[in-house]
Amino acid sequence: IEITSTGFNPATLEVKLGDTVTFVNKDNQAHWPASAMHPTHTVYPGSDIEKCGTADDNNIFDSCKGIRQSEEYKFTFNEKGSWGYHDHLAAGLRGKIIVN
């Protein structure tokens, strides 16, 4: 999924259980992809912004920091469902991952 100043492309992505999704920042500003809802990031099971900086931060749908231009954030989806996400640094930018 590419991240630009106008949002995520594609904004909605359908994947299979166990697939890894890569977010790539194509903007010159930092972006912070994370599970909905802003500001807690708790919609995806087990995710919570409060887990950033802990031993659990590699297991949550949260980059836990702004990623710079050309940097990537990867997350493997191990829960079926429709998972909203957003940019923590620009909360109006939103998308959805559908895991089948």
Model-identified regions with their sequence ranges:
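Extracytoplasmic copper-binding redox domains, predominantly the cupredoxin/blue-copper superfamily
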Residues: 1-100
